[in-house]
A protein has these predicted regions:
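Residue register within tetratricopeptide repeats
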Residues: 10, 47, 86, 125, ...
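Linker/hinge segments immediately adjacent to helix-turn-helix/homeobox DNA-binding domains
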Residues: 352, 356, 390-442, 457, ...
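Helix-turn-helix DNA-binding segment
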Residues: 421, 428-475, 479-502
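Internal alpha-solenoid helical repeat scaffolds
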Residues: 1-227, 235
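Residues within the DNA-recognition helix of helix-turn-helix
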Residues: 52, 396, 473-476
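Residue position in alpha-helical solenoids
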Residues: 18-22, 59, 78, 94-101, ...
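Structural motif corresponding to the intra-repeat A-B loop/turn of tetratricopeptide repeats
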Residues: 6, 43, 82, 121-122, ...
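Alpha-solenoid helical repeat architecture
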Residues: 24-35, 63-77, 101-114, 138-154, ...
């Protein structure tokens, strides 16, 4: 286990294969099965991982139901990532047959596996009530229990509780860094970067995804690589970096072809469509999302989260009839989710189809997702301008432009600026004071740690790079930030939160 945690999969696998012939004690059998399955999954052998977990659970089910339950929960999560209803149902059925006790602490996790089966067969809305408790339970675990906390972070993302997902993930990343658990860092960065993305913390998401990608590549975890590249493709789309988005999307498709895991593919298909939408290629965006829904992506939560893009693409392409199904999909989920952001986004989508001051006002209620709020401001401002209410339109268009600029959402900022000019207001160039935008993802990671007072050696230990590499990146970052020493860097204080303004 220590070799796997330290990011040494080859050594861990060799030791596990040797141990499998020697171990007889039930708990040791369970831990060994978990380890072998984890190595197989991280290296892309997903079906092998599933079979190892089921076999291991069978061997210890009578003697240690809790250990068997943990393995079956992992098997269910892995099968969900394959968009494989049969395998999820198999894990759920075996969980039902175990003699689990309340004190085993697995009730919420078992319910989540049951809910995953419901989600794959009947859609994600019906799974929400059963999934929420796992996310909230995981937030209360302070240390250890890595499997439950990782599952909890994933589930928090599935139920739209992105701040909970971020809190769990931040704690996991910090703990893994401190304990040198390199092998677990990529999955922790997957959940952290995903949460930051949904919350509009794009610079942090890019930096954390890039760091997770570096470690996943170094430790031979192709599944994590594909997932993180999908997140980076989505961020590239928002920034308007067409070449980078397309290149990362190709890599995600290759990972899917090799492993069958749909997470990265779901992100990359959404990324390509989001790029098309932001650049005004509305019919192309709509066609792309509809095509994605014909494959395994339809079982992923992104099918709910990209429904607003599908609706907007249909409306802007002059094809409102094709917005009906995604609107129903989003409304069904939002009605059960009862989240402020989901209600606001649903209102925005309805306002695009039937513009109205009252509906747009509902779309503008605060909810913690700045990109979605800015898109509502833009949509409202566009409609007001078309209605010849230019004075009313300008504050909304101005607010949209300022948010898009802060987020680095170039194509959206250009659209908002054009609308604002059409509404009779000149627009200024983006502020030159955003010093963090010039930093590379690794420079940003290092600067964020340096400002806390950590030495180069301590930063290197956290990020698994040499002190010399840390020094090199700080040397490159200082002039970009307008400082020449660590003392001046520390004075910047809160200004070094890359997403504080969002």
């Amino acid at each position: 286990m220590a070799a796997a945690d330290a990011g040494l999969p080859e050594r861990a696998q060799a030791l596990a294969e040797r141990a499998v012939r020697l171990v007889e004690e039930p708990r040791s059998i369970a831990r060994l099965a978990e380890l072998r399955a984890r190595i197989a999954f991280e290296r892309g052998s997903v079906h092998t991982a599933h079979d190892i977990l089921l076999s291991g659970a069978d061997r210890v089910a009578e003697l240690d139901p809790a250990a068997a339950g943990l393995m079956l929960v992992d098997a269910g999560r892995n099968a969900w990532q394959l968009s494989d209803p049969r395998r999820v149902e198999e894990a759920a059925a075996r969980l039902r047959r175990l003699r689990l006790r309340p004190e085993d602490g697995l009730d919420a996790a078992v319910d989540a596996v049951e809910a995953a089966a419901v989600s794959l067969n009947a859609g994600p809305a019906g799974a929400l009530p059963a999934m929420r408790p796992l996310a909230r339970d995981a937030r209360g675990i302070e240390r250890g229990s890595y499997g439950l906390r990782i599952n909890g972070a994933f589930v928090a993302g599935l139920v739209g509780e992105f701040e909970t997902q971020r809190q769990i993930s931040v704690a996991l990343v910090e703990e893994c860094r401190t304990l040198g658990m390199t092998g677990l860092l990529p999955i922790a960065y997957v959940t952290l970067a995903g949460a930051e993305l949904y919350l509009g913390r794009f610079r942090s998401a890019a930096a954390d995804a890039a760091e997770g990608l570096r470690i996943a590549t170094d430790t031979g975890q192709p599944h994590r690589t594909g997932y993180l590249e999908g997140i980076l493709a989505w961020i590239a789309a928002v920034e308007g970096d067409e070449d980078r988005c397309a290149g990362l999307a190709v890599r995600c498709a290759d990972h899917f072809a090799a492993t069958g895991i749909a997470n990265g593919l779901a992100w990359s298909e959404w990324a390509l469509a989001a790029l098309d939408l932001s650049l005004g290629r509305h019919t192309r965006a709509l066609d792309r999302l509809e095509a994605a829904l014909a494959g395994p992506v339809r079982h992923q939560i992104q099918a709910v989260y990209f429904a607003p893009d599908q609706i907007e693409a249909a409306v802007r392409a002059g094809l409102p009839d094709r917005a009906k199904e995604p609107l129903e999909r989003l409304a069904e989920w939002a009605d059960v989710a009862r989240l402020d952001w989901a209600d606001a986004v649903l209102a925005r989508c309805r306002a695009l189809l039937e513009p109205d001051d009252e509906i747009f006002s509902a779309a503008l209620r605060p909810h913690g997702r700045p990109l979605e709020r800015a898109r509502a401001e833009l949509g409202y401002g566009e409609w007001l301008r078309r209605e010849r209410r230019r004075r009313d339109a300008r504050p909304h268009l101005r607010a949209a432009l300022e948010t898009f600029q802060r987020l680095g959402a170039g194509p959206w900022a250009r659209r908002a600026a054009a609308e604002l000019r059409a509404a009779g207001e000149a627009t200024a160039a983006p502020a030159a004071s955003d010093r963090l935008a010039a930093l590379s993802p690794q420079e940003l990671q290092i600067v964020r740690l340096a400002v806390t007072g950590l030495t180069n050696r301590e930063i290197g230990a956290r990020l698994f790079v040499s002190p010399k590499t840390v020094s090199h990146h700080l040397y490159r970052a200082f002039p970009k930030l307008g400082v020449s020493s660590r003392v001046e860097l520390a004075r910047l204080g809160p200004d070094l939160d890359p997403d504080a303004a969002t």
